[in-house]
């Protein structure tokens, strides 16, 4: 894989406890050529010094120090500095599996979006070596739509992005939207998917995703972020479809519908929601959705929310109680 050069972008902010483990795993990567761009986003602990230390030891590590501006700004800084043909976003409290092998790397010549597997582990859990991970790349004979309907990815760390589609030119380059705390990674991914033509799947576990106590994504704070930010993300995606003349294909319809459902589910579990304002937002987004040529959602819950958010909340709470979830 001498011709496969990837830029690994690592946003860093106050992760001194985990950072060395992350960078050590990257330094052991031998399957292809790489550079690692470490973006220190104004860390107040020793994370910035650790980044500099690794850059002095290995020229493949490059460091950018910037004032704290958030993870999206850090990723964008990494994108601007990237020299590789491919892009891989790695979180600084996670690690990668450097021991995988790819038996038929030539298939990558035609791919422009590569999905692979990840494993989740709890903080403090010892990672055991993986067996039978030969990394055989499977480029199926499915159409792009069929492939993307079959294989979904909610973690952008499980993806290689072809830089060609990310950085077409200065005016058309993709970037992470600023000002939102959830969904910006999916927004970036879906926009990229509207451009790519040859998605592929790598049959290997390349990424280790750490589950940290206190970083849960289903607490009330996270649900409130969903309530506030997902409407913005959905709105930007619909505007992107309009500006880029994106066809309303099933794979994209399915993904945006999931965002709608996540928004409604989160809102139903948050206390003190302004139901009137939420209903107005949902109706406006669904109207914009229809104007872009997407079929009106078949989901009975989505239809109910369009008629009455309050009725949706009541039905959803009854359903959750029956399931013993809430």
Briefly describe each language-model feature range.
Residues 66-82:
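Glycine-rich, basic loop-to-helix element that forms the pyrophosphate-binding segment
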Residues 268-326:
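Membrane-interface aromatic/basic loop that binds lipid-linked glycans or pyrophosphate carriers
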Residues 24-33:
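Short, acidic, metal-binding catalytic loop of nucleotide-sugar glycosyltransferases
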Residues 10, 33-42, 62-67, 91-92:
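Short beta-strand/loop segment that forms part of the nucleotide-sugar
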Residues 204-213, 218-248, 262-290:
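Catalytic core of nucleotide-sugar-dependent glycosyltransferases
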Residues 71, 92-200, 207-225:
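Donor-binding/catalytic cores of nucleotide-activated saccharide
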Residues 87:
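Short aromatic/hydrophobic "clamp" motif used to bind/position activated sugar donors
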Residues 25, 40-50, 91:
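A conserved acidic beta->alpha catalytic loop
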């Amino acid at each position: 894989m001498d011709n496969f050069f990837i830029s690994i972008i690592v946003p860093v902010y106050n992760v001194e406890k985990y950072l060395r483990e992350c960078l050590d795993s990257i330094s052991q990567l031998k399957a292809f050529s790489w550079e690692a761009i470490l973006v220190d986003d104004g860390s107040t602990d020793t994370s910035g010094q650790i980044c500099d230390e690794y850059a002095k030891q290995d020229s493949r590590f490059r460091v950018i120090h910037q004032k704290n501006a958030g993870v999206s700004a850090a990723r964008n800084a990494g994108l601007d500095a990237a020299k590789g043909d491919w892009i891989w976003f790695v979180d600084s409290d996670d690690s990668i599996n450097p021991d995988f092998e790819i038996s038929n790397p030539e298939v990558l010549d035609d791919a422009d979006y590569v999905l692979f597997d990840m494993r989740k582990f709890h903080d403090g859990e010892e990672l055991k070596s993986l067996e039978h991970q030969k990394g055989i790349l499977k480029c199926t004979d499915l159409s792009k739509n069929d492939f993307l309907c079959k294989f979904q990815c909610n973690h952008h760390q499980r993806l290689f992005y072809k830089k060609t589609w990310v950085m077409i030119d200065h005016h058309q380059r993709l970037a992470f939207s600023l000002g939102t705390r959830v969904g910006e990674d999916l927004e970036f991914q879906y926009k990229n998917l509207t451009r790519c033509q040859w998605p592929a799947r790598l049959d290997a576990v390349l990424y280790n995703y750490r589950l940290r106590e206190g970083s849960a994504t289903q607490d009330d704070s996270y649900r409130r972020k969903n309530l506030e930010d997902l409407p913005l993300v959905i709105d930007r995606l619909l505007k992107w479809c309009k500006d880029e003349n994106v066809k309303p294909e099933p794979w994209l319809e399915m993904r945006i519908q999931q965002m709608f459902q996540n928004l409604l589910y989160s809102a139903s579990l948050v206390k003190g929601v302004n139901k009137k304002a939420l209903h107005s937002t949902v109706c406006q987004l669904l109207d914009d959705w229809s104007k872009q040529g997407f079929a009106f959602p078949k989901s009975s819950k989505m239809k109910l929310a369009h008629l009455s958010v309050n009725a949706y909340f009541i039905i959803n709470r009854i359903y959750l109680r029956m399931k013993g979830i809430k």
